[in-house]
Amino acid sequence: MSDGTSNSTHFGFKTVEADKKADLVAGVFHSVAAKYDIMNDVMSFGIHRLWKRFTIETAGARPGMKVLDLAGGTGDLTAKFSRLVGDRGEVVLADINDSMLKVGRAKLRDLGVVGNVSYVQANAEALPFPDNHFDIITIAFGLRNVTDKDAALRSMQRVLKPGGKLLVLEFSKPQHEVMRKLYDLYSFKILPKMGEFIAQDAGSYEYLAESIRMHPDQDTLKGMMQDAGLEQVDYINMTDGVVALHRGYKF
């Protein structure tokens, strides 16, 4: 989604040319890739693992299924899906950022996750897969970084099989004022300092906090998924809406 013009969009709180955003986001993730897993644990106090576990459970992957872990980064979801779909299944870990893919591939191979996992560098707005290909698509903490979210959702809907399910796990909008104030304090005062201390990169974590605030709220994203052709769309708030899991189906 743009900020109201056809050739501009947001990068955090900044307005930039739409065709520049992907490179700017790439710079952020090239910078943070090596410390990404450590920072996730520290930033969320480990709660991100519970959010991802719930996403995996909600996905309902079974042996033999084809799963796309889009913006899959360092492979947390891919590792779990690989075990669930088994030897007859397939998991594709796709990410636009080659630094994140390299970290994810090395991590999963160290864990012994091989055989039914492949790695693809791909732009979510134009997925390089056939129509009606995947039983399940997940995108965890990635949609907010996409320039044209509507195009990405349409692309995901296209490559889902009829009966397939899309799950979007993303930071969202806290539901209560006290939580909103605490979350703002944490995001804008504490998080960048963590980024500087652990990853020597305060700027990238300032962007991440800003990108969360610019992401569509729960009901807006639900409407965007419906507009992309997904049906029976709903969402589940977690941690008072700090994170929401949206799900939709293709029939």
From Swiss-Prot:
SUPFAM superfamilies registered for this protein in UniProt: S-adenosyl-L-methionine-dependent methyltransferases
Biological process (GO), any one: methylation
EC number assigned by the record: 2.1.1.163, 2.1.1.201
Biochemical pathway: Quinol/quinone metabolism; menaquinone biosynthesis; menaquinol from 1,4-dihydroxy-2-naphthoate: step 2/2; Cofactor biosynthesis; ubiquinone biosynthesis
Top class in the EC scheme: transferase
Keyword tRNA-binding: no
Reactions accelerated catalytically: a 2-demethylmenaquinol + S-adenosyl-L-methionine = a menaquinol + S-adenosyl-L-homocysteine + H(+); a 2-methoxy-6-(all-trans-polyprenyl)benzene-1,4-diol + S-adenosyl-L-methionine = a 5-methoxy-2-methyl-3-(all-trans-polyprenyl)benzene-1,4-diol + S-adenosyl-L-homocysteine + H(+)
Listed InterPro entries: SAM-dependent_MTases_sf, UbiE/COQ5_MeTrFase, UbiE/COQ5_MeTrFase_CS
Transmembrane segments: none
Key words of the record: Menaquinone biosynthesis, Methyltransferase, S-adenosyl-L-methionine, Transferase, Ubiquinone biosynthesis
Positions that bind S-adenosyl-L-methionine: T74, D95, N123, A124
GO MF annotations, alphabetized: 2-methoxy-6-polyprenyl-1,4-benzoquinol methyltransferase activity; demethylmenaquinone methyltransferase activity
Gene3D superfamilies: Vaccinia Virus protein VP39
Family: Belongs to the class I-like SAM-binding methyltransferase superfamily. MenG/UbiE family.
Record function comment: Methyltransferase required for the conversion of demethylmenaquinol (DMKH2) to menaquinol (MKH2) and the conversion of 2-polyprenyl-6-methoxy-1,4-benzoquinol (DDMQH2) to 2-polyprenyl-3-methyl-6-methoxy-1,4-benzoquinol (DMQH2).
HAMAP family: MenG_UbiE_methyltr
Official protein name in the record: Ubiquinone/menaquinone biosynthesis C-methyltransferase UbiE
Species name: Shewanella amazonensis (strain ATCC BAA-1098 / SB2B)
